[in-house]
UniProtKB/Swiss-Prot annotation:
GO terms for molecular function: D-tyrosyl-tRNA(Tyr) deacylase activity; Gly-tRNA(Ala) deacylase activity; Ser(Gly)-tRNA(Ala) hydrolase activity; tRNA binding. Disulfide bonds: none annotated. It comes from Burkholderia ambifaria (strain MC40-6). This is D-aminoacyl-tRNA deacylase. InterPro entries: Daa-tRNA_deacyls_DTD, DTD-like_sf. A motif (Gly-cisPro motif, important for rejection of L-amino acids) lies at residues 142-143. Belongs to the DTD family.
């Protein structure tokens, strides 16, 4: 599974005229299930995402996770947006291949599992809508962006 995470001041996702998720300071995570991914891979990726230290401590060092963005136990928001294009194979030609991505039904199942697990472990979780044409708006903080990937 893959997550492209961005530290944000705020972010939201819309489907048409409807806002499906919105956060203040925290992490926007674009999430993709690959062929062969399992719940174990989703759990491993979620643990990494929730524990990844990308927020600055009092000394200005990236040393705090999304669960403690202010150093006093204050949790930041987590906006999870499905994005199968992260699994694209771009090694040949001028058109990406999406063969490495999980099939849509499996991708939806794993994304839903990931979201449910995140909601059990983090107090502020918002989402996009799997398979929808979404408009994502964000204000990067830094910018700070990381590619997280775990293998099944």
């Amino acid at each position: 599974m893959i997550a492209l995470i961005q530290r944000v001041k705020r972010a939201d996702v819309r489907v048409g005229d409807r806002t499906t998720g919105e956060i203040g300071a925290g992490l926007l995570a674009l999430v993709c299930a690959e062929r062969g991914d399992t719940e174990a891979a989703a759990d491993k990726l979620l643990a990494k995402l929730l524990g990844y230290r990308v927020f600055s401590d009092a000394a200005g060092k990236m040393n705090l996770p999304v669960s403690n963005i202010d150093g006093a136990g204050g949790a930041g928001g987590l906006l999870l947006v499905s994005q199968f294009t992260l699994a694209a194979d771009t090694n040949s030609g001028l058109r990406p291949s999406f063969t490495p991505a999980a099939p849509p039904d499996e991708g939806a199942r794993l994304f839903d599992y990931f979201v449910a697990a995140a909601r059990e472990r983090h107090p502020i979780v918002e989402t996009g809508e799997f398979g929808a044409d979404m408009q994502v708006s964000l204000v990067n903080d830094g910018p700070v962006t990381f590619w997280l990937q775990v293998r099944p």
